[in-house]
């Protein structure tokens, strides 16, 4: 047993005899893995099967042995390997974990017989059903969609499977199951997808599978003092009805679903009594009736509340009361676009008045640290849009500072400035990373202008806020974000580069050059409206 588990609650330990061993990989560190609700949910669903013993693997740190957390067994002892992937920057980690476990990283190199030593690799998670192709070479099977409706049918089929070549039957009969080896791609001279060929009997398009309703909201199954978030999490629903044009989650989790108050309270009621901090996922969907139910539960159980961010136009008196009683010290609001015009372009639907009113209401409720999240590099963005954001921040300060002073408190603003990355399945999937006009983007074959354009915008905002008291600005590095933009819309040709990066054999730039891949092709090149995408 890993030392980290001595302080963990919710660990599942099963005897191996008579059970099918399943490894569950999370391609990042333990603190992030144990904070990921999707990873925890999959761990519970797999171990809920009487036929399965599931143990977790996380990305190894400091050259520690690559063994399962529960029993310290090597990956080669598991005939079935699941991977839960959420973020593009973890793709290379996944490839490295397979190699560290002694598993041939490419599915094509694994023996036909499925057994310990030559396991079947199944990948899923939001990163996979957004765009499975960057990881297609590493997977025998991929799950396109949410786990709950797929696993009851998939797990018995996998348990009975002995030959990798029989996977096509699962792909043909099980909704949401994608067998990458059964699909081949042809590209034109410009590197764009020209044609997708499919093996006989398989669907031309594997449609995403979604959970229709839930009697119990997904919640933390495992708690650890080493978790990144350090709270008990409960999901209020999935998806979002707002339709912001940049947001992948708002499109790939369609239709938006808000769980019933009974389902949410059932999830909250699983909280260990000694845990008094609750995190809610999906606050932007919560209606007044649900908030009332949650508020009653939290007050009765003396719990405090936390969440990732709030919509500025959904801050009700009941929510403010709940926040005030929770002793929350900071709240994040996401304008996303720098100006009201840009927020219209991205379909955010927030006015300047909404944002100022939200800031005032939050400070009035005793929350003196406000975080504002904004993107640069959005389509049609100009310096005027940046200047309007500077003015917005100044107006917010003018409104909230006197309120804080009357209460003897300093108000603090934290600005998070991030480079916009176009995502699959969104209306912005056709756009260029870097925010350049189409003609300039077509000429920017080394991506230098895209990165410089973003750096220029970030520098403008940093300079504007450099001498402002009680204001902190956090920015990303566009040259580093470029790799995320590449992986986001990449196809399976990126696989060898991911393997080299994961094994530490090359930097991102070196790997792209070695394998004759173009960052411009994936990240900066504008797409045509009639283009065929690999994720389709």
Regions found by a protein language model. Give the residues of each.
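Flexible glycine/acidic-rich beta-alpha junction loops that bind and position SAM and/or redox cofactors
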Residues: 184-187, 289, 318-319, 341-346, ...
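A short beta-strand-loop structural module common to alpha/beta enzyme folds
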Residues: 50-62
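Glycine-rich beta-alpha loop elements in corrinoid/cobalamin-binding modules
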Residues: 59-197, 423-491, 500-502, 506
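Conserved SAM/AdoMet-binding glycine-rich loop
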Residues: 25, 265-371, 375-412, 422
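N-terminal [4Fe-4S]-dependent radical SAM core
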Residues: 1-23, 30-31, 180, 185-234
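Radical SAM enzyme core and accessory elements
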Residues: 1-10, 22-24, 456-458, 462-536
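N-terminal pre-triad scaffold of radical SAM enzymes
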Residues: 22-28, 46, 220-246, 329, ...
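Iron-sulfur (Fe-S) cluster-binding segments and ferredoxin-like electron-carrier domains
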Residues: 246-263
